[in-house]
A protein has these predicted regions:
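Non-transmembrane, aqueous-exposed alpha-helical and coiled segments at domain scale
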Residues: 1-431
């Protein structure tokens, strides 16, 4: 069984929390794209955990975690993340963590270039809101065949050294010529690679074969996405996207088993909207600054990876319907419903008014999206604490009505509803 858990919106939907919940039913959890540019926050009986690179299944002792070939991995960050979790009592060994030999390495100069370019763009207001983790530059070099992969750490021989020299020479033309930065040292980069080769050599393997064998043996595999459909490099709000494919259809490819097909796709959707970074975000126009501040504080909307305040707004049903379509969702997990407890009436963006005066429920692109205005409708709020609810019947009628409205609006059944940060604070809603 191959299941993908993906984001329906801009990311930060609560995928890590849902993976932590659902992974108890699975043998393997695999990340298939992205790097340490976004974070998954999981709170359970053992504490609060922030994960950037590691799959959320790492918090379950009986689950094997896989980092697939579609990922870009900063070994320095990964080492720190592993050590932090070990300090929190989480066991991480080659037995429960396997890293693809085909995953691309984020080098220190990728991170440096990201920061330098964002600083350059910010002078003219043209920045993208990068997390400055080197993600775009790693993926860019991957497609130009100018970087190394984790498998190269297993044989740091003369051929790898020659490739490194060529890559550094090419990168220095940019670093010195465009940014007037200090040149990159081949010797320093080689020492850096040797350090992390020693740390990760026992974790690196052919994860594609591992997953194929596991699937053939009847093991259950859960694919974990980073970010959401609206950040996908092809189907997201370009150019305000990430540099990888966040959609579930890419999961088997990015994990290492490209010939396999998903059995089930679970899309994760917030009960309201949030976004980190620049680009059009129509729903934020539906609230006053005071209303947005109240929602941000109620939802603790600050980036797990960056700490930046997230942009917020009502749930955007135009964007969410498009996200469900992109992800091919069979079911939806609705998160953070309890955040809306304080609202007397619940706003929803149900359509966009375009600059030509027309109204649409289809998600537009380009200039049409840039200038779109939200059409807002309201449902009565429940205005009470729902964090103790564990069954559908425990929810106030107003909360039930809201969930049912969302189901019809996005065209997909909602089977999970989270009503709190703790692991057990959810409702499994099967009709």
């Amino acid at each position: 069984m191959l299941t993908a858990i993906t984001g329906i919106n801009w990311g930060d939907e609560g995928k890590g929390r849902m993976v932590d919940l659902i992974s108890q039913e699975y043998d393997i959890v695999a990340r298939y794209q992205g790097g340490n540019n976004a974070g998954h926050t999981v709170k359970n009986e053992r504490g609060k955990f922030v994960l950037n690179l590691l799959p959320s299944g790492i918090l379950r002792p009986d689950v094997v975690c896989v980092m697939g070939n579609g990922m870009v991995i900063d070994p320095h960050h990964l080492d720190g993340e592993i050590n932090k979790l070990r300090e929190q009592g989480i066991s991480i060994t080659p037995a429960n963590l396997k890293i693809s030999d085909r995953a691309t390495i984020t080098m220190p100069y990728h991170v440096d270039q990201d920061g330098l370019e964002e600083a350059r763009l910010s002078k003219t207001g043209a920045q993208f809101g990068s997390t400055k983790r080197g993600i775009a530059y790693t993926y860019g070099d991957k497609y130009m065949k100018k970087t190394l992969r984790m498998g190269d750490l297993l044989h740091l021989d003369d051929s790898v050294h020659k490739r490194l020299v060529t890559m550094v020479d090419s990168k220095n033309l940019v670093m010195e010529g465009s940014y007037n930065a200090a040149p990159i040292s081949v010797d320093e980069m080689w020492a850096w690679l040797e350090k992390y080769a020693a740390i990760f050599k026992d974790y690196i393997c052919d994860v594609g074969q591992y997953l194929a064998d596991a699937d053939a043996a009847g093991k259950k595999v859960l694919f974990e996405a980073q970010l959401g459909a609206l950040r996908d490099i092809d189907f997201g709000i370009y150019p305000y996207t990430t540099s990888s494919n966040t959609i579930g259809a890419y999961a088997p490819i990015g994990a290492g088993i490209p010939g396999h097909k998903l059995t089930n796709s679970v899309g994760v959707m917030k009960a309201y909207s949030s976004c980190v970074g620049d680009g059009p975000f129509v729903t934020e126009l539906a609230m006053t600054e005071e209303e947005k501040h109240a929602l941000r504080e109620a939802g603790h909307e600050y980036g797990a990876a960056t700490g930046r305040p997230r942009r917020v707004g009502p749930i955007d049903l135009v964007a969410s319907r498009y996200g469900v379509f992109c992800q091919g969702c069979d079911e939806v997990a609705l998160t953070l419903l309890d955040v809306l407890d304080y609202m007397e009436k619940i706003p929803m963006v149900t359509a966009y008014k375009l600059s030509d005066g027309t109204t649409t429920t289809r998600f537009p692109m380009g200039e049409a999206l840039d200038t779109a205005q939200p059409v807002v409708e309201y449902l009565p709020g429940w205005h009470c604490d729902i964090t103790a609810a564990r069954k559908w019947e425990d929810l106030p009628k107003e909360a039930q009505n809201y969930v049912e409205y969302l189901e019809k609006a996005v065209g997909c059944k909602i089977t999970y509803i989270s009503v709190g940060a703790e692991r057990e604070a959810y409702i499994h809603h099967v009709v």
